[in-house]
Amino acid sequence: MNRIDNQESHRWRIENCFMLLPGRRVGRGDVVIDGERIAAVEERDCKPDKLVMPGLVNCHGHTAMTLVRGLGGGLPLQRWLDEAIFPVEAKMTAKDVRAGAVWGIMEMLAGGTTCVADMYDFPGEMGRALTEVGMKGRICRVGLSFVPGRLEDCIESTRSFNEWVDSQKVGDVYEDICIHSEYLTDEKFCRALAEANRELKRPLHVHVSETRKEHEECIARHGKTPIAYLADTGILDFGGYAAHCVWCTDDDFRIMAEKGVSLVHNPTSNMKLGSGFARVPRAMELGVNVALGTDGCASNDNLDMFEEMHIASLIHKGLAQDPTVLPAWDVIEMATKNGAKALGLADTGEIAVGKRADLCVVDMMRFHLAPAFDIPNLVVNSMGAADVELTVVDGCIAYEKGGNDCGFDGCLVANTARADLLAAVGRLGL
């Protein structure tokens, strides 16, 4: 890195960069960071050897599923869950989840992701791992009406974790409310959680209309689609972010736009499991904020948001038989500023003075990134997680390629991460 540091003032700069700037502009020059924020964007004539872009925001993941990466490949969703995933998850302990979470957080940071919305058991383990490794996030305790006491656990977990974060000032990591899906929570649970959320005031993280079967069975049960049903329970009153939305209707999209519910597009996972994929261009036409997510890496099988951008771009062009659908800038914003909006992240998602310095820095000297005629096109169609050389979260270097062996200098958790992961896999009998 050609980087100038001033350790006393915590002011430093990233020099000789292409920069993805507001207004869908590509600039050249330096980004100056002071403390947690961007202090200056200095445009000048230079020969860039790197790209600085907003940090990537993964709006739907099950991070600890690094433990089961690739398990059950080739099975459709319901068989994949019932035969491969649920039996292993039933054996997972908090220690196992922590090991998988730390490994997944490191994988994401090494690929330029600065924030993740995670849905998994033992959310406190994920939350603490995020604060220790140095990443932003939204966690949640998964709402399931068949688990005794889960409603009360969800409410208390959200309240107590967020109070801990605020009192300890450990970073932008908060717990949102969550139900797994319409089909795993009954109406009584949804309405009770919605009522409790009048005090908590948190957005909802939920799976919606991932498969045709799920979508149609909800209509048979309630006479309405999952989105319409959830809206009627009041659980969307403080907004949210809905993963998948593969089978959502135009009316569903209108409800989402009205309620401030973002659509989280998971193209790789949906394609791998044969579910189809969300009608993203139509959702955008109807005013829905669309973000991107990897889903769990057991159905992906990585946490590479560059790959997610690439696949999202290709499938909608191919379906429409129109190369103008979802231009590169749209897809980049889905992975950055739209994701920040979906999760309620403050002052981030853009490279502008005063914004928080959540940044992804890419090495432009790689063979496959030259010539650089069209930077947005390169981001979406040529770049990958392995091209990232620096990830910055709130002005702090969270990952730097060429630091210690894994790029996480000074992070004690990282030192034992691989051994912890493999030990957990062994305990689970995999």
Model regions and ranges:
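Active-site microenvironment of metallo-dependent hydrolases
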Residues: 1-29, 33-34, 335-430
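Active-site gating loops and adjacent loop-to-helix segments of metal-dependent hydrolytic enzymes
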Residues: 67-99, 106, 133-147, 212-237, ...
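Metal-coordinating catalytic core of metallo-dependent amide/deamination hydrolases
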Residues: 125-246
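Catalytic core of soluble alpha/beta enzymes
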Residues: 210-240, 245-258, 271-282, 296-307
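Alpha-helical scaffold segments that flank or form the walls of functional sites
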Residues: 69-135, 157-168, 417-422, 426
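Divalent metal-coordination and catalytic microenvironments
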Residues: 17, 31, 36, 49, ...
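His/Asp/Glu-enriched, well-ordered alpha-helical/loop segment
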Residues: 232-239, 281-366, 382-383
